[in-house]
Amino acid sequence: MLPETFKLEIATPERLLVSADIKEAQIPGEGGYLGILPGHAPLLSALQPGVISFPREGHTERLVVTWGYVEVLPTKVTVLAEAAEKVEEVDVGRAEQALQRAMDRLKQATVDVDVARAQAAVRRATARLHVVGKL
């Protein structure tokens, strides 16, 4: 018999953001978003910048995460992220500025521009703006 819930833990090096029993979650993995339900087959994936969402106490909770790893087990999902923010912690002005700086760097496309780093900055800023409804 499959469990009805699983434990979700989301942590950064600085803090534990979430530790809750939930019924489902969407997590940005290396190959796209992972839909996780109780009893999911075990897997380990790189975490991509994006939004983790899960229903909790009558509403959908959403967090922005950057790089890291996600471990999925049938009764527990652990997300270890370089950085993560709850919706109310996102600084919209800062995210908009970061997106503009990264886009400007990509437009330059000279030898001096670290394209991969600029693309990563675009993904992080886009995820932050998406979670607060600005994209």
Regions found by a protein language model. Give the residues of each.
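Compact, glycine-rich, soluble single-domain proteins
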Residues: 7-101
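Acidic/glycine-rich phosphate/pyrophosphate-binding loops and surrounding catalytic core
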Residues: 84-135
